[in-house]
């Protein structure tokens, strides 16, 4: 009886994990970013990038890579919700002077991903008030 109960519990857990993983997988976004920016602790040049979600046991990691395959990085994120939703995918940047930090990734629905602030962004933001802007990706800009 105890063995059957353990097997049922394991099967239930596996189905929940598999369902969550399948549900959370998203189509990768390919986007052209027209300016240099910071992502995590790295400075990246303007160019074409691909953003993909990778599901882990502790949360979602965003995989950011250049279209030419040169730079690949993994960014730890947390969920962020919008009351209004985002009709189109968009990337949100925090701007301090000429320095732009990738802050949020929205795939065109009510739930997006918030990046944790890097040490550099925390340091810059102490003495300077930043502004936020979104790079809205229209359906013609999004390559899937």
Where are the model-predicted features located?
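Sec/Tat signal peptide C-region and signal peptidase I cleavage site
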Residues: 19-24
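A short tyrosine-centered beta-strand micro-motif
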Residues: 47-51
